[in-house]
Amino acid sequence: MGKKVAIIGAGVSGLASIRSCLEEGLEPTCFEKSNDIGGLWKFSDHAEEGRASIYKSVFTNSSKEMMCFPDFPYPDDFPNFMHNSKIQEYLTAFAKEKSLLKYIQFKTFVSSVNKRPDFATTGQWDVTTERDGKRESAVFDAVMVCSGHHVYPNLPKESFPGLNHFKGKCFHSRDYKEPGVFKGKRVLVVGLGNSGCDIATELSHTAEQVVISSRSGSWVMSRVWDNGYPWDMVLITRFGTFLKNNLPTAISDWLYMKQMNARFKHENYGLMPLNGVLRKEPVFNDELPACILCGIVSVKPNVKKFTETSAIFEDGTTFEGIDCVIFATGYSYTYTFLDESIIKNRNNEIILFKGVFPPLLEKSTIAVIGFVQSLGAAIPTVDLQSRWAARVIKGTCTLPSMEDMMNDINEKMERKHKWYGKSETLQTDYIVYMDELSSFIGVKPNIPWLFLTDPKLAMEVYFGPCSPYQFRLVGPGKWPGARNAILTQWDRSLKPLQTRVVGRLQKPCFFFHWLKPFAIPILLIAVFLGLT
C-alpha cells in the first residue's frame, strides 16, 4: 500500500476521502467518534458533545440528482428532497458498495494532531486517539480533516443585553429535536437561517405564537421551482453561471433580484435582506411565506434587549410572555485537535487554498474537506475536494508556491466580500469552484469538444443541471455510466412523482428558462421599433 492517511470523521466528507484514498492507492484509516457513519445526517434523540446534531424533521435542500456521489445515483423511487433517514440509508449503501467500513475505527476520539519534529522534510503527523479510556499515538504521512463545521454552536449571549435576567428557557438550535414539548408555548427564534426557519414553521403548528428575529433578513426560496421542478435542477446550470458572471453588473443584479422575488415580494413579508444584491446563501423553506400570511409566524428585527419575560426589538415593539428563546445563530469554526498555527483564522476567515489546503506549511500533507458552502450540494463538492487532496498527497498533483497560494486566497476573498458580504467567508460560486477543482485533477468536461463529438450530451451538460455525473465523464476515476446518468437524470427526478399518471412526462427546456426574463423587454423594444 501507499502512504498512510488519517481521516478524521466518517460523515459524507470522511466517506468520500476514504474512497478517494483507495482510488489513489493510499492507505486510509478513518477515526469516527460515534458508533456509526453519517456525521451530520445521523439523527440522535439528544445532542452529543463534539458531534453535529440535527432535528428529527430535517429534509435536504438539494435534490437527489444534484447531491449524489457521481458514480452512485440514488434509487429511482427515492423522493427528490429526502428526509435525513433516507440520506443515512444512501450513505450506508454507498459505504457497503465501495467496501469502506473496514477502514473506519468507530468510537474513537482524535484528541490531537501534531507535526512530527522532522515535519519540514517528511511532512508526517503524530495523531493521538482515545478509545475505551486507552490513549494511542500513531504516525501518518498525511491527514484529511473531515469533522465538519456544524459542531460547536455559536451562542452570542453577550450580544443580547438582559438575557441573563430572562426567566424562560434559552438554548441553541442544535439542542432542538421535535415540537411536541412546545405545545401552547410562546417561542422566539433568533436567526433567519435554514434551521431557524425550519424550527419556526414546525413550531407554528403546536406553539401558541412564534416570532422570528432577524438582524439582516434573508432571501427565502422554495424547493419547488418553475413548473414544479426541483429548484437546483433549474437554476444550477453552466449557462446560468455564464450569464451571471458575464452580464453587466446592473443586469446581473436585476436578474438575481427578480429570481429571488419570483415567488413573493420579500419587502412585503419583512424578509428583505439589508443588502439585497449580495449573493448570500438563501434560506430554503416552503412553508414560511404561508405561515406569515396566516399569522402563525411573525418576523421582527434584531432584539435590542431582553427582560424577565419579554424581548424588545430595535423597532421598539415587544414580544411579551416568552416561554422559550431558541438561538439559531450558526456555528463556530474550530478544530480542537489542531494547533491554531496550522489552520489560521483571519477576521473570521479560515485561510485555506481553494478551501482545502493550509498555504503556509512546509509540506502540503493536511487537507480540510467540506469546509466550503455554496448553492450546490455538499456530496459532489467533497467528492472533488477529496479526489484532488488524495492526488496531492500521492504526489500526482502539485500545489503552487506559498506566495501564489496566498495571492489566490486574497484575490478570491475580495471577490467573496463583493458578492456575498464579509460574514459569508465560506461561500463560493458552485460551478466555478467545481470546475477549478476538476481542472486540477483532469476531469473537467470539455464543453466545446462535447458539442463537436456528442451534441446531445453537450446540450444537457451546458444548458441542463450541472449534476455530479459531469465530473466522472472523463479523466482519472472516469465512470462508464456517467453519460447515461446525465441523459436520464430527468427520468429519475420525475419517477417518484408518477404515483398517478395523467399524461406524458414533460421535461423542461432550460435555454428558454434563462431567456424568459428578457422576453418582455425584447417585446417592448420590438413594439417601439414597429411604431417608429
Curated annotation (Swiss-Prot):
NADP(+) binds at T60, N61, S195, G196, C197, D198. Its EC number is 1.14.13.148, 1.14.13.32, 1.14.13.8. It comes from Macaca mulatta. Its cofactor is FAD. It is found in: Microsome membrane; Endoplasmic reticulum membrane. The gene is FMO3. This is Flavin-containing monooxygenase 3. The modification Phosphoserine is found at S401. GO terms for cellular component: endoplasmic reticulum membrane. Essential hepatic enzyme that catalyzes the oxygenation of a wide variety of nitrogen- and sulfur-containing compounds including drugs as well as dietary compounds. Plays an important role in the metabolism of trimethylamine (TMA), via the production of trimethylamine N-oxide (TMAO) metabolite. TMA is generated by the action of gut microbiota using dietary precursors such as choline, choline containing compounds, betaine or L-carnitine. By regulating TMAO concentration, FMO3 directly impacts both platelet responsiveness and rate of thrombus formation. It catalyses: trimethylamine + NADPH + O2 = trimethylamine N-oxide + NADP(+) + H2O; N,N-dimethylaniline + NADPH + O2 + H(+) = N,N-dimethylaniline N-oxide + NADP(+) + H2O; hypotaurine + NADPH + O2 + H(+) = taurine + NADP(+) + H2O; (S)-nicotine + NADPH + O2 = trans-(S)-nicotine N(1')-oxide + NADP(+) + H2O. It is an enzyme of class 1 (oxidoreductase). InterPro entries: FAD/NAD-bd_sf (IPR036188), Flavin_mOase (IPR000960), Flavin_mOase-like (IPR020946), Flavin_mOase_3 (IPR002255), FMO-like (IPR050346). Belongs to the FMO family. The keyword NADP applies. Gene3D superfamilies: FAD/NAD(P)-binding domain. GO terms for molecular function: albendazole monooxygenase activity; flavin adenine dinucleotide binding; hypotaurine monooxygenase activity; N,N-dimethylaniline monooxygenase activity; NADP binding; trimethylamine monooxygenase activity. It comes from the Eukaryota.
